Design a protein with these regions (language model features):
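N-terminal secretory signal peptides that target proteins for export/translocation
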Residues: 1-5
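Bacterial N-terminal signal peptides
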Residues: 9-22
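Extracellular ligand-binding/catalytic regions of CAZymes and related secreted enzymes
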Residues: 27-39, 57-58, 68-69, 228-358
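Catalytic beta-strand/loop cores that center a nucleophilic Ser/Cys/Thr
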Residues: 29, 67, 73, 93, ...
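Helical hinge/lid and interdomain linker segments adjacent to catalytic or ligand-binding clefts
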Residues: 30-35, 45-47, 51-144
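Nucleotide donor/acceptor-binding cores
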Residues: 42
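Oxidoreductase and adenylate-handling cofactor-binding alpha/beta cores
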Residues: 65, 156-161, 165-168, 187, ...
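A glycine-rich, often tryptophan-bearing local segment used as a flexible ligand/cofactor-contacting loop or short
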Residues: 101, 110, 114-197
């Protein structure tokens, strides 16, 4: 069974002024060139691969916005099935391919969970970090890798989140799949450019516990536990779990031995469903521009380039699910919109776009 992919009429997806250009899929990667390529264009590599939060949906959507509306070249990486399979399999912790793309990257956006790249793939992450290049971590990037293998001589896979992003896996701070999270700006940083045009992030995936940040970190947003998964639900003002609210987005300085000092941005939001929220998309776009030395717009355009139909976050225990879906990188190219049913057993969430019934 092939996952349904909605191919849009080209006239319907071309924006005024010829904004959109075709995307090129080179083997296992998905590449989006900007409308006006050139030597000064910055390159972002977006790495998907997690078992629960559908980063394989999120990263192509963000790459389209960053490339077509903000002038970046974007390369999206995926996890694939075992034994050289050509289908995307986000459950395969050893399935990452294409990390060589980091050799020419100016920014890495990562949303993986407990990945175990082999030494040949890992060396590209090592070189990227040794150069002190910037990193954006989404949601499970706090536990992006697992195991005692190393990036270079001293940074184990297990240490990536804590050392590079400032935090590791701690806990779910709200009731998962029952309570969401709403952002509150940290006092004193209201004028930070990463918050330009960002008013109110709501994430149905909830907020993580965050306990390891230090005075070297700059907290931009805190996340308050909300009454429900409804985007209009209020923060539980008198709940002790919101005293204090957990850090939700922050900047972190990192250094690894033999490497230069670098900077990272992390948010514990990041399920594909969370990115229905325009303010979250803007937060990540702003951080991308900021970390690559650009001028952050007052209110960045973060409208979808193609329709976006995220599925509900959930672990998928069917070992044949991804093989049956048979999704390929090119299914996420420009003018294409994959759509899958939610995994069974999840709550209804009618606050997202869905394809029109035929």
């Amino acid at each position: 069974m092939r996952v349904p992919v909605l191919r849009l009429c080209w006239a319907a997806v071309v924006l005024a002024g010829g904004l959109m250009v075709d995307s090129a899929s080179a083997g296992d990667t998905l590449v989006f060139d900007p409308p006006h390529p050139g030597d000064s264009v910055k390159h972002i590599v977006l790495i998907s691969g997690d078992e629960e939060y559908r980063s394989e949906e999120t990263m192509p959507m963000l790459a389209k916005i960053l490339s077509q509306k903000h002038g970046f070249k974007c390369t999206v990486l995926f996890a694939f099935g075992p034994d050289g399979a050509d289908y995307i399999d986000s459950n395969n912790q050893k399935g990452l391919r294409g990390l060589k793309s980091l050799d020419s990257a100016d920014l890495m956006i990562i949303a993986t969970r407990f990945r175990r790249p082999d030494a040949e793939q890992a060396k590209h992450i090592t070189a990227f970090l040794d150069a002190g290049k910037p990193v954006i971590g989404l949601r499970t990037a706090t536990h992006a890798f697992q195991g005692g293998e190393r990036f270079g001589d001293s940074l184990t896979y297990d240490q990536f989140g804590l050392k590079i992003l400032g935090e590791q896996w701690v806990s779910h701070h709200g009731r998962h799949k029952a309570e969401g999270a709403r952002s509150v700006v940290e006092p004193g940083v209201e004028s930070h450019v990463i918050l330009n045009g960002v008013s109110d992030v709501f994430a149905p995936s909830d907020v993580y516990g965050v306990t390891h940040l230090t005075n070297a970190d700059t907290i931009l947003l805190r996340g308050g536990i909300t009454e429900s998964l409804d985007p209009e639900s209020k923060i539980l003002a008198y709940d002790d779990r919101n005293k204090p609210m957990q850090p939700f987005a922050w900047l972190h300085p990192y250094t690894i031995p033999n490497g230069k000092e670098g900077r990272s941005f992390c948010t514990t939001a990041g399920a594909s469903l969370d990115f229905v929220d325009e303010d979250l998309r803007r937060l990540v776009v702003n951080a991308s521009v900021y970390l690559t030395g650009g001028q952050v717009p007052e209110k960045a355009d973060v409208g979808y380039v193609d329709p976006f139909y995220p599925t509900f976050f959930s672990f998928i225990n069917d070992k044949d699910y991804y093989k049956t879906m048979n999704m390929k990188p090119e299914d996420f190219g420009l003018g294409k919109t994959p759509h899958r049913p939610d995994p069974p057993g999840n709550p209804a969430w009618p606050f997202r776009p869905v394809p029109e019934a035929k």
